Regions:
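N-terminal low-complexity segments that are often proline-rich with Ser/Thr-Pro
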Residues: 1-31
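Helix-loop junctions on the cytosolic side of multi-pass membrane transporters
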Residues: 3, 31, 39-44, 290-299
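Structural signal for alpha-helical transmembrane segments and their membrane-water exit/capping regions
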Residues: 3, 27, 32-40, 206-211
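12-transmembrane solute porter fold
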Residues: 21, 39-213
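Hydrophobic transmembrane architecture of multi-pass small-molecule transporters
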Residues: 22, 193-287, 292-293, 299-306
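Residue-level signal for alpha-helical transmembrane segments in multi-pass membrane proteins
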Residues: 32-36, 109, 136-140, 207, ...
Length: 306
């Protein structure tokens, strides 16, 4: 039996991979040297001792909530548009565009306000606007809204975000030494992402649960003893009789009513979740007053870590 000789091609080193690996080594070494130059208590990757400073701990909590609300609403509205308004993914994303433009316009104003007023006051205003925005959304959200009104709802929802984000980020550094700046920035960004993950999961679960709840309640009216249901069933049966006569028309009519029931139940579930977010924002107003009364430039409200 004749064996075929196989020639092995020499492996050519991946230049891009080597450069990337070398870059990671250099960055790790630089980070290690920077961490070693810090005081011992600030060398940990995440220094949880920073949470003993009340101002920082409150800011971390508020950032979890704000980041969670931002990410949850960014998922909820396109999800509502695609499932119930039958938007394409592209069209649902375009409905969020106006909110991004609003953020660009409001961000400089929020920065000016943060430099003049205490962070707790700005946050209280921001969370009050959040509560009003979500309540407004819950009372105006329906299955017949237009693309323009859907974009307007997004503008209303994101308008308070710059006030809250900038104020929390600035207030988180009050009372902390400069050596902890990197730690503060890292933890604040980390808890924001954690809050986003938690809220996306929770709001999705609540929407599903409330949809089932409303389906059960609405289905109680789908009885032959209900004149409204009988009239609707008769009208749809007559409409479908030309397409599917006899039992087929009745089945098609009941299917149409059931689809409408599912849509109404899902719409009410989205209204419920926005009401939940509104009440959460009301509670965040109270949390804002746990922060220091100091304005920017008035000095640290607490003693530096020693």
């Amino acid at each position: 039996m004749q064996r075929q000789a196989h020639t092995r091609k020499p492996k050519i080193p991946d230049a891009h991979g080597q450069v990337a690996s070398l870059t990671q080594v250099v960055e790790f070494q630089q980070d290690k040297e920077q961490r070693q130059s810090m005081p011992a208590k600030f060398r940990a990757w995440f220094n949880i001792k920073l949470f003993r400073f009340k101002n920082f701990a409150v800011c971390a909590l508020l950032m979890i909530l704000v980041g969670g609300i931002l990410n949850a609403t960014t998922v909820l509205q396109p999800q509502f548009s695609q499932e119930l308004l039958h938007y394409t993914a592209t069209l649902a994303g375009e409905a969020l565009t106006a909110g991004g433009v609003a953020l660009l316009l409001i961000m400089p104003l929020a920065g000016i306000a943060t430099g003049r007023f205490a962070a707790r006051n700005i946050l209280a205003i921001g969370f009050t606007l959040f509560a009003a925005a979500f309540y407004y959304t819950s009372t105006h959200l329906n299955l017949g809204i237009s693309f323009g009104f859907s974009s307007w709802l997004r503008v209303v929802q994101v308008a308070p975000i710059p006030l809250c984000f900038i104020a929390i980020t600035n207030a988180a550094y009050f009372g902390l030494p400069k050596e902890a700046s990197n730690q503060v920035a890292g933890i604040i960004n980390f808890v924001r992402n954690v809050g986003g993950s938690i809220f996306i999961s929770l709001t999705g679960a609540i929407v599903t649960d409330r949809t089932l709840f409303h389906e059960a309640r609405l289905s109680e009216n789908m009885q032959l003893s209900n004149p409204a249901y009988v009239n609707q069933l008769t009208a749809l049966t007559n409409a479908y009789s030309g397409v599917a006569g006899g039992p087929g028309a009745v089945a098609s009519a009941r299917g149409m009513i059931y689809r409408q029931l599912n849509q109404q139940a899902a719409g009410q579930a989205y209204e419920d979740i926005y009401r939940v977010l509104a009440w959460l924002a009301v509670g965040m107003v109270a949390c804002a007053f746990l922060l220091s009364k100091k304005k920017p430039g008035e000095g640290a409200p607490e003693a530096a870590a020693g």
